[in-house]
Amino acid sequence: MNAVYLISLLITLLPCLVVVACATKQHISYQRDVRPIVVDKCIDCHSPPYGEGYTKTGLDLVSYKSLMKGSVYGPVIVPGNSKKSPLNMLVEGRAGDLARVLKRQHNPMTDDEIKVIRLWVEQGAQNN
């Protein structure tokens, strides 16, 4: 009798657990969530023609299109894979000396901002 009760309870609660899990997954928008971070933290150095980061790497962060184009070294975003995405490696401090330079800047990204960038890349880095 207890097994039947537990199975019934589990079947009843399973849809609730699925709804809660889906509701807690935050959808990240480039325009609403990511772009304001880029404008606040990155665009001064990564905008043509004179931004220091732009002149050194060719990485232009003025638009989604130029971000996705990448730098002279190649793409900086691997949609769906923040672990292999060079941008994430930099802002998360996983890129050696260059990451340390970013951390010393006057206005480094907060942990929450880094999380937003990570989630956006993991969700496919869409222009939405």
Give, region by region, the residue ranges found by the protein language model.
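N-terminal export/targeting leaders of redox proteins
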Residues: 1-29, 126-128
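Aromatic- and Gly/Pro-enriched helix-to-coil junctions and flexible linker segments
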Residues: 22-128
